Amino acid sequence: VNVFFLISGYFTINFKLNKFLMLLGEVIFYSFFIYIIFAIEGGEILNVKNIMKYSILAVNEYWFMTVYLVLMLVAPYLNIVIDLLKADKRKYSIFIITLFAITCIYGFAFDKDVINVNGGYSLIYAIFLYFTGNFIKTYDIINDCKKMHILYMLAGGVNFLLALFLVYLGKGNMAWKLFSYNNPIVYIQAIALFISFLTIKCNGRIGIFIGRFGQYTLGIYLIHSHSLLIPYRFRELEIIMKDMGVIFWPFLILLYCIILY
């Protein structure tokens, strides 16, 4: 999710009504199609309330799509701010650092309902990532940062060890919080992963492969994140994880994500 918002900022969003409506239509299609299947199978009641919920109001089923569609609407104004800032790297840097302090320091450590960063599941955090992505492109950060894949693995390792330590102390909720989108370590990981992919030359078959599979990513997200499917999505994984040690959880989750995709 973090990387997707970074990509949006890197290339910037040029709002077009037809693209907005096409994206909204895709959300409605997947949501309503899944609902109809459940209704036919008897797992959901077919009535006006549910038809409205899974069609016209379908966007509420997906926090990410809600945030992204709103981000598309406000993007023209964000781009104006970018035009004002990018002429002065110092001011833009201070702006990014300020947003980082608000969303990833205060928002991660203390925020409840004050600024509603909500663990990164929010518009304000998406906007911060949008600016970050643009900052990377504006000042060509790619050429200044080498071997970012190493930073990505180091940050991931540190976060994982911290989580294990908290689980050992019986602080399971705190351990889970470490995987919030606005955890400073996760934020750094996202940037490192994003820049790593930017430095890869995707020519020939690799480029074709990524292009073909990339176009299905949104559809896959809309399917496995649907509220009617979520109870079934993790059921088998939870059963397996109960019988496995905590140290194997990341590998199980990675394998499960690959299978799910």
List each model region and its residues.
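Transmembrane alpha-helical segments
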Residues: 5-16, 70-74, 78-81, 128-137, ...
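Membrane-interface helix-boundary motifs at transmembrane edges
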Residues: 13-22, 78-91, 136-150, 199-211
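Alpha-helical transmembrane segments and terminal signal-anchor/GPI-anchor hydrophobic tails
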Residues: 124, 142-219, 225-253
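Transmembrane alpha-helical segments and their boundary/interface "anchor" motifs
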Residues: 1-5, 12-71, 151, 155, ...
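Alpha-helical transmembrane spans of integral membrane proteins, capturing the lipid-embedded, hydrophobic core
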Residues: 19, 23-35, 68-69, 96-101, ...
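Loop-centered beta-sheet repeat module
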Residues: 95-141
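Hydrophobic membrane-embedded alpha-helices
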Residues: 22-53, 75-115, 146-176
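Interfacial loop-to-helix transition and helix-capping segments at the boundaries
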Residues: 1, 52-67, 109-129, 164-192, ...
